[in-house]
Amino acid sequence: MPETLIKVDLTKSAYENDKVHNRWHPDIPMVEWVNPGDDFIIETYDWTGGFIKNNDSADDVRDIDLSIVHFLSGPIGVKGAEPGDLLVVDLLDVGPLKESLWGFNGFFSKQNGGGFLTDHFPLAQKSIWDIKGLYTSSRHVPGVNFAGLIHPGLIGCLPDPKLLSTWNERETALIATNPTRVPGLANPPFAPTAHAGQAKGDVKAKIGAEGARTVPPREHGGNCDIKDLSRGSKIYFPVYVPGGGLSMGDLHFSQGDGEITFC
């Protein structure tokens, strides 16, 4: 059995786990190192770090602070990987945590996040789905039972300083074209809720001030939400920093490409 490099404790805040982070920045320290060709297991939180609960109220979806997301396990360094290389990642298997066999779907409130269909569905809604093997069903959507295709919505490598600067400049300019749009066109760095993994002191503060938010996909991978990136997939990532810095999270049991189901 491969070694589990990163574990999560669902009874504690994700901020207490120094092997996860919720921003992209070249100075986030590697939490583990592996050799090329190594097999390993990593556990992840859901994208909210456990904020959404298994209950019948959508208040948590309505009230979530969206600046905390996404909580990613990593970064993991690969020995010998250097800028300019391609990091090849084989997803050998993907599955839910045995102690948490459920997931959720929902609509954000128009007052907090919005979505593609926010004018049609302005109020927060949530459904809980119980996972039984390959299938799922929901007490909130009676009569539906279907097989999922489990995949990480978010997987990628750390940017270098130049790429990070490009992202922040590009997204700042995009926001300025329509700063009041709901949902927003992009999300700028936001230090108060940044989790910089094992970074300390001035480095932690720098990551908070400059770290790119994890919402969009970018040149390094990121929040691609490609449903076919499941078990058996082979993914090629450009390496920007020594070691690459692979991170992943935002696991989905079932979702269409692009994540428009969470509208």
Per-range role (PLM):
Residues P2-I64:
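N-terminal, Lys/Arg-enriched amphipathic/low-complexity engagement segments
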Residues Y15-H25, D65-S73, A212-H220:
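Short, structured beta-strand/loop micro-motifs enriched in basic residues and often containing a Trp
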Residues V20, M30, G74-G77, D225:
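Short, conserved secondary-structure segments in the cores of folded domains
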Residues G37, A81-G84, G232:
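Loop/turn positions that initiate beta-strands
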Residues I42, L86-V89, F237:
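A generic structural signal for residues embedded in beta-strands
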Residues W47-A58, V94-G106, G243-F253:
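Short, Lys/Arg- and Gly-enriched loop/turn segments at beta-strand edges
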Residues D93-S230, Y236:
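Intrinsically disordered, low-complexity linker/loop segments enriched in Gly/Pro
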